[in-house]
Amino acid sequence: MYLEQLKEVNPLTICITNNVVKNFTANGLLALGASPAMSECIEDLEDLLKVADALLINIGTLTKESWQLYQEAIKIANKNQVPVVLDPVAAGASRFRLEVSLDLLKNYSISLLRGNGSEIAALIGEKQASKGADGGKVADLESIAVKANQVFDVPVVVTGETDAIAVRGEVRLLQNGSPLMPLVTGTGCLLGAVLAAFIGSSDRSDDLACLTEAMTVYNVAGEIAEKVAKGKGVGSFQVAFLDALSQMKSEMIMDK
């Protein structure tokens, strides 16, 4: 349902994301059926966000200048009622990253918070091991998702071996995906953009259902890619993953 709607709407998804993943993110969105724009010029965004369907803010390659860009872009998105997805990459790795993430969450309207366990744990003040964007192992992603949902009053997606989605106090746990996905730089960052595209093309009447389908589509594509690339390595997996995203249909996830 939501995937077909995305393909029909072809949502314009503005991605202010990190320098490492821009190409992969744009290609992933195109494969799925969305329309990516990677602009980082405020004068440009003033017009683009009037017609955009979603905005992704990914703080991966953070600078003082980019912090100001995030703030200005979110202000414009909020003014135009464009949903904003925040990916607080490595929020627990430095005080500066934590400060920026909390500023954006507390002072602007964010539609979805997406991160791994250690990133979201850092935002709610829980001590967890963090190794940059990959994060450390977190025992209870469900409780972290629930608490973050309560603290920030925003839908939350926490990714790990089991993914947790929390919306208005309701939680859903998902276990699809491939162990090869974390071995390709940008799969987590692309996920943030994919979630933005799904939200941006929906009517927002049931975020939990929308996010559940988005996560399942993404993770099942990873499973398909793993089978295709078996014995070939992570380079082949990356290509197979983009291929799988381009071929996904809702019926492929009916029993997942």
Curated annotation (Swiss-Prot):
Question: Which EC main class describes this enzyme?
Answer: transferase
What GO molecular functions are on record for this protein? ATP binding; hydroxyethylthiazole kinase activity; magnesium ion binding
Question: Recorded E.C. number(s)?
Answer: 2.7.1.50
- Swiss-Prot/TrEMBL catalytic activity: 5-(2-hydroxyethyl)-4-methylthiazole + ATP = 4-methyl-5-(2-phosphooxyethyl)-thiazole + ADP + H(+)
Residues annotated for ATP binding in this entry: 114, 159
* Pfam hit, one: HK
Q: Name one GO biological process term.
A: thiamine diphosphate biosynthetic process
Taxonomically, the superkingdom here is Bacteria
- Residues that hold substrate according to the record: 38, 186
- What InterPro entries does the record point to? Hyethyz_kinase, Ribokinase-like
Which cofactors does the annotated protein need, by name? Answer: Mg(2+)
**UniProt keyword annotations, A-Z:** ATP-binding, Kinase, Magnesium, Metal-binding, Nucleotide-binding, Thiamine biosynthesis, Transferase
Q: Which Gene3D superfamilies match?
A: 3.40.1190.20
Tell me the pathway: Cofactor biosynthesis; thiamine diphosphate biosynthesis; 4-methyl-5-(2-phosphoethyl)-thiazole from 5-(2-hydroxyethyl)-4-methylthiazole: step 1/1
Recorded family membership: Belongs to the Thz kinase family.
- Annotated HAMAP family: Thz_kinase
Q: What does this protein's UniProt record list under function? A: Catalyzes the phosphorylation of the hydroxyl group of 4-methyl-5-beta-hydroxyethylthiazole (THZ).
Q: What is this protein called?
A: Hydroxyethylthiazole kinase
Task: State the organism named in the record.
Answer: Streptococcus agalactiae serotype Ia (strain ATCC 27591 / A909 / CDC SS700)
